[in-house]
UniProtKB/Swiss-Prot annotation:
<feature type="modified residue" description="Methionine amide">
    <location>
        <position position="120"/>
    </location>
</feature>
<dbReference type="GO" id="GO:0005576">
    <property type="term" value="C:extracellular region"/>
</dbReference>
<comment type="similarity">
    <text>Belongs to the met-lysine family.</text>
</comment>
<dbReference type="InterPro" id="IPR018802">
    <property type="entry name" value="Latarcin_precursor"/>
</dbReference>
<dbReference type="Pfam" id="PF10279">
    <property type="entry name" value="Latarcin"/>
</dbReference>
<feature type="signal peptide">
    <location>
        <begin position="1"/>
        <end position="22"/>
    </location>
</feature>
<keyword id="KW-0732">Signal</keyword>
<keyword id="KW-0964">Secreted</keyword>
<feature type="propeptide">
    <location>
        <begin position="23"/>
        <end position="69"/>
    </location>
</feature>
<comment type="function">
    <text>Shows no antimicrobial activity against Gram-positive bacterium B.subtilis B-501 or Gram-negative bacterium E.coli DH5-alpha at concentrations up to 20 ug/ml. Shows no toxicity towards insect (S.carnaria) larvae.</text>
</comment>
<protein>
    <recommendedName>
        <fullName>Met-lysine-1a</fullName>
    </recommendedName>
</protein>
<keyword id="KW-0027">Amidation</keyword>
Length: 121
């Protein structure tokens, strides 16, 4: 039950972080898509972990089962840590792509603005 509450709290935290990041940047549409993709990945990973955790509820409450439960939780924590690290790396790569795309987008916007001025004036 504790692992379920912890995993649910993580899902909510990642969703909140994802939402707050898109509100403070200039790349709203593109970043919203990427944040949404990351949030979906986090949610899927956590739901998978929750499914595994719910399977553990069938274990009896003996010392041996408690040890198995603890081993399983440690394994789940390591898997989640690896998934989060991978997602952070992907997020950093997306950030680099955005840095590369931003000057091009600004230049294109300037060109379009200039064309509109020429047509109107």
């Amino acid at each position: 039950m504790k692992s379920f509450v912890f995993a649910l709290a993580l899902i909510v935290a990642f969703a909140c972080i994802s939402e707050s990041k898109s509100d403070h940047t200039g790349y709203e549409e593109e970043e919203n898509l990427e944040d949404s993709e990351l949030t979906d990945l986090v949610t899927a990973a956590l739901l998978e972990e929750l499914a595994e955790a719910s399977e553990m509820d069938d274990l009896s409450y003996t010392e041996e089962a408690g040890g198995e439960r603890m081993d399983k939780l440690e394994e789940m924590a390591l898997k989640l840590k690896d998934k989060l690290k991978t997602m952070a790396e992907k997020g950093a790569q997306m950030g680099e792509k955005l840095k590369e795309m931003l000057p091009k987008a600004i230049e294109k916007l300037k060109e379009l603005t200039e064309k509109m001025k020429n047509k109107m004036g």
